[in-house]
Amino acid sequence: MSAHVAAGFPESWEEIVVRVLKTNAVRLVTYVPDKVLAPLIKRIHADDYFTVICPAREEEAVGIVTGAYMAGMRGIVLMQTSGFATLPNALASLVLPSRIPLLMMISERGTLGDFQLGQVMVCRTMRPILDSMNIENHAIERPEDVEFIVERMIRQAYATQAAAAMILSPLLTNRARHGER
């Protein structure tokens, strides 16, 4: 339990994610740096439970988590929307045919006032790509839904040996409220 939870404050979304990952034995975390995911990444780095790898590209992160799964270790790939845009080939040629329960946590960009046209275009294609690949995906918009969705997505991915994507809405991460770009 964190100090601020002990003091009566609610857990932050990133504290909940860390707790649920640990409860479900997800030890390996790969990520490409992202401002929205920075609070989660900082907490994960601070916790000796996790093995953390920061590859150069999201495709490498997928390969690392896939290899770890084949060796008996559970892992997750953290990325932003534009990073997901680089993954369809790796998903279609490695993850899906091999039935790898790849967990992806994606910070959603390109919506709710994001002014970067590239992010907007990628955001519009992300869910259709996930759906066309039959990858279970759910957006998390409220702190009270974090535990339920993350827990269920992890369990479902491993029970069905299928990839799963958890999309962190700006409504959850507060990016849209603070005018971040």
Regions of interest found by a model, annotated:
Residues 1-181:
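Thiamine diphosphate
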